[in-house]
Swiss-Prot record:
PROSITE patterns: SPASE_II. The lineage of its organism: Bacteria, Pseudomonadati, Pseudomonadota, Gammaproteobacteria, Cellvibrionales. It comes from Cellvibrio japonicus (strain Ueda107) (Pseudomonas fluorescens subsp. cellulosa). GO terms for biological process: proteolysis. The gene is lspA. This is Lipoprotein signal peptidase. Its EC number is 3.4.23.36. Belongs to the peptidase A8 family.
Amino acid sequence: MTKKVYHQYWFWYLAAFVVFLLDQGSKHWIEAAFDYNETKVFTSFFNFTLRYNPGAAFSFLADAGGWQRWFFTIVAVAASVLLIVWICRVASSKPREAFALSFILGGAVGNLYDRIIHGHVVDFIVVHYQDYYWPAFNLADAAISLGAMVLIADLFINPDKTSGEKPTNA
């Protein structure tokens, strides 16, 4: 592995670490500044409300009895290892993909940390329209979503040139 490639994938790992730090810093701040379920309204469609989510996205399995903490921990660890390897493989050749993966990795590790340390994920960002409220989320969730959107957009912007080719027999 060349020195240039080595530095490129470490750049993306550093980006993931920055996402993790921003996520954890925001969660630390919200827990210090707010009581549970306390709301601060910023606009007619955006507010902060401190909430705890023992489940996954959209509180999936939040009331499952406790086993979900370790199940989602194992899933997050496996996904993080996969993302670390994937970033290493694409760091020098696909920077947009590496960017997306680093945001997903940083967000995944941020929520993983919460789940291991607190037994739940700290959520606080609430977006709504009139009486319809999107489930509360955090910066880690936003980073994961942004990374996923960039990956999907990249599929359309740069389709794999080999996807339409038939494999050749050697």
